[in-house]
């Protein structure tokens, strides 16, 4: 059995390019100070020899691991069942891959998970962190801050210290909710119910606020809390029908809850949209197109949200730049617009 060819070394690349080992190291590790003709010779030698830098050695030089932690504050059963997370992770993955960075997925459900994640982050395994689906009063932001890692959050900050130099990407949740309710009013509906998401998350709070902006005098009996799952939407719809059987419209805080609400309405013999008009939030395809009837909903670009989170973090990781961590600097956020997509449910 023949032995495999030895792995090309930095010295072999230097000999092929006719330059010093230090010059090869600077080019391979992305440092400035090498004239372009020399840099091109090094790159050509790297290609010809099939040289692959040793990541451990490279990390010692650059102090970079080319790896980013993506922390989702949800149990794995939720993350792998809800297509929202797949969309956001796809956007993050595309951006990181385009810049030769690896994604390290960390899920946290309880305090034991928080401690495990905090130890991992403090261990110097990754260059930064992307965090989403945080819950109000979650200890994660403080743990991440103590690890000293550049971080970008998905969603508006809403925790102690959350106004100091926080980087985040969010959707115009409040404006989207207003658009949804105004659309229902334009259809002549007046007894409009709202199924909220989990109210320990800012997206649900903002959508409830948007609902109240338009329906300031609404009956509290027309609001029921869900948790962004289809089962909670179905349960909430039954509760609402029990309290207010005269309701003529529902704005659900996401498409999964809207799909659950549609099931409950069918069970109770309510026609959609004739008896009750229904609007969701997300435009989660193919769900929104496959409900019966197809769902009118507020579209947010979930994948773009993930891409922008990764892009902001990678920008902070570039040499010579750093996130603004000055106390009192205020959050530095990007808020993405939303659009109402009209289908048959309203």
Language-model segments: what does each one mean?
Residues 23, 63-77, 183, 191-197:
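Short beta-strand segments enriched in small/hydrophobic residues
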Residues 1-66:
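N-terminal helix-turn-helix DNA-binding module of bacterial transcription factors
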Residues 1-5, 67-71, 75-182, 242:
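Alpha-helical recognition/docking segments in bacterial nutrient-uptake
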Residues 74-87, 105-113, 169-179, 195-238, ...:
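Hinge/beta->alpha junction and helix N-cap segments in small-molecule ligand-binding domains
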Residues 243-346:
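Flexible loop/turn connectors
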Residues 190-192, 218-221, 272-278:
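Short acidic capping loops at alpha-helix termini that bridge into adjacent secondary structure
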């Amino acid at each position: 059995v023949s032995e495999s060819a030895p792995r090309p070394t930095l010295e072999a690349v230097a000999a092929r390019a006719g330059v010093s080992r230090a010059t090869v190291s600077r080019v391979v590790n992305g440092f400035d100070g090498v004239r372009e003709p020399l840099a091109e010779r090094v790159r050509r030698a790297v290609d010809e020899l099939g040289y692959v830098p040793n990541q451990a050695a490279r990390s010692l030089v650059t102090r970079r691991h080319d790896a980013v932690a993506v922390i989702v504050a949800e149990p794995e059963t939720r993350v792998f069942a809800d297509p929202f997370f797949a969309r956001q992770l796809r956007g993050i993955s595309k951006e990181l891959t385009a810049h030769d960075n690896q994604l390290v997925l960390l899920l946290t459900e309880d305090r034991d998970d928080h401690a495990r994640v905090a130890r991992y982050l403090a261990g110097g395994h990754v260059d930064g962190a992307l965090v989403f689906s945080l819950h109000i009063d979650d200890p994660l932001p403080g743990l991440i801050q103590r690890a000293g890692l550049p971080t970008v959050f998905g969603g508006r900050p809403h925790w102690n210290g959350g106004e100091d130099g926080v980087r985040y990407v969010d959707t115009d949740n409040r404006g989207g909710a207003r658009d949804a309710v105004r659309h229902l009013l334009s259809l002549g509906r007046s007894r409009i119910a709202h199924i909220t998401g989990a109210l320990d998350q800012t997206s649900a709070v903002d959508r409830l606020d948007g609902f109240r902006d338009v329906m300031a005098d609404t009956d509290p009996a027309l609001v029921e809390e869900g948790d962004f799952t289809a089962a909670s939407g179905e349960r909430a719809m039954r509760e609402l029908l029990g309290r207010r059987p005269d309701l003529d419209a529902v704005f659900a805080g996401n498409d999964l809850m809207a799909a659950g609400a549609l099931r409950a309405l069918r069970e109770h013999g309510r026609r959609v949209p004739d008896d009750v008009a229904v609007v969701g939030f997300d435009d989660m395809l193919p769900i929104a197109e496959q409900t019966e009837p197809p769902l009118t909903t507020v579209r947010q670009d979930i994948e773009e949200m993930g891409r922008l989170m990764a892009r902001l973090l990678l920008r902070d990781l570039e040499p010579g730049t750093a996130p603004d961590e000055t106390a009192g600097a205020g959050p530095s956020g990007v808020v993405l617009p939303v659009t109402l997509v009209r289908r048959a449910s309203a």
